Amino acid sequence: MGLQAPFRSGGGTSRPQGRAAPRAVDLRREVHDAARRARVASRVLALLPAVAKDQALRSAADAIAGHAELILSANAEDLETARAAGTPSAMLDRLALDTKRVEGIAAGLRQVAGLPDPVGEVLRGYTLPNGLQLRQQRVPLGVVGMIYEGRPNVTVDAFGLALKSGNAVLLRGSSSATRSNQALVQVLRASLVSEDLPADAVQLLSADDRATVTHLIQARGLVDVVIPRGGANLINAVVRDAQVPTIETGVGNCHVYVHEGADLEVAERVLLNSKTRRPSVCNAAETLLVDAAIAEEALPRLVTALQDAGVTVHGGFARDATEDDLRREYLSMDIAVAVVDGVDAAIAHINEYGTGHTEAIVTTNMAAAQRFTDGVDAAAVMVNASTAFTDGEQFGFGAEIGISTQKLHARGPMGLPELTSTKWIAWGDGQTRPA
């Protein structure tokens, strides 16, 4: 597969100093034109049989693996620029690719190819008394916009899930990953062409200008849904300004509540895994709640375990956690600690400070566990298990495009079914509706 210079979808050139070129108009046109091309491509994908989509995904996986050198070279340039800008180490880790990570990206596409095709799945069907046969089945959403930060792997994950579910995807990544994303999309587009599929099923929008985001999220009628994936500022801005339907994902102020009926050995294990396994992801625990009835015994043990693991504790022994501590999504080796007076107080605290992502209770009291699971408002609730399990692959349905913290159209880890809508189909033999 011959590849040219990295693909760019507009916005990659700077305008000369002192000339008032209508860049804003041009950028809006570029985004809208890309969306129109995506719409055309989406109609092709919507009619593809599962076998063709799976072959295209396997071809893309082979192309990613076969062009690892190109991808890693582009990523090295991004990393060099990021280091020179003083980017924190945690963000550098999100940005970085190596041979193993590229292999993992390719493996992810092959995994998606092996998943059941959601398109055409019949959710319900029945025959009316007049003989009219009704069925409701899954259909693609159409054109999906993805806005995300930092992680080049999201570029390929979004492509794979969109293709499998029959959708075209418009990608707007972070400027910090521009070269990496260009290289990846270049490879993906070439692989689509090699399978006689439209390259415009995946397009990378310019990350050089923040106005790209505005034009994408306001392209009502051209884009069917936008999924922002990143920090709170990004997600809040998209949800606030969008005219296109959005699915809010990712912000996770997750809690581990240690009930008075907890086995403290289990509590320590669950807490440490929830906090330290990958502290920079949205399902990491950010607050520890300890029941007042066992605080004298449990707090020293749990706080010491956290500190021994390298976690900075905000609250606990020396002082109460502040309001800012309790509302913060740290995404680092930090955690807030507070004492609550029983399960109802824990529920009230979480419903006040949580973000509707993942909450956990540790207890041997099943009545308390049931009250907690019923009362907490979250996409996922864990009983005696780590918050880290909120993940599409861990839940057993494969890759995810994000974790929705809203209640419409999807909630929790979003896999292939969540990238579909539904269509009602009626089969008749001449039925008419009475006056």
Curated annotation (Swiss-Prot):
Residues 1-24 are annotated as: Disordered. The keyword S-adenosyl-L-methionine does not apply. Keywords: Amino-acid biosynthesis, Cytoplasm, NADP, Oxidoreductase, Proline biosynthesis. Its main location: cytoplasm. Its EC number is 1.2.1.41. It comes from the Bacteria. Coiled coil: none annotated. The keyword Amino-acid biosynthesis applies. CDD domains: ALDH_F18-19_ProA-GPR. Pathway: Amino-acid biosynthesis; L-proline biosynthesis; L-glutamate 5-semialdehyde from L-glutamate: step 2/2. One of its GO terms (molecular function) is glutamate-5-semialdehyde dehydrogenase activity. It comes from Mycolicibacterium paratuberculosis (strain ATCC BAA-968 / K-10) (Mycobacterium paratuberculosis). GO terms for biological process: L-proline biosynthetic process. It catalyses: L-glutamate 5-semialdehyde + phosphate + NADP(+) = L-glutamyl 5-phosphate + NADPH + H(+). NCBIfam families: PRK00197.1, proA. Belongs to the gamma-glutamyl phosphate reductase family. Catalyzes the NADPH-dependent reduction of L-glutamate 5-phosphate into L-glutamate 5-semialdehyde and phosphate. The product spontaneously undergoes cyclization to form 1-pyrroline-5-carboxylate. PANTHER family: DELTA-1-PYRROLINE-5-CARBOXYLATE SYNTHASE (PTHR11063:SF8), GLUTAMATE SEMIALDEHYDE DEHYDROGENASE (PTHR11063). It is an enzyme of class 1 (oxidoreductase). This is Gamma-glutamyl phosphate reductase. GO terms for cellular component: cytoplasm. It is found in: Cytoplasm.
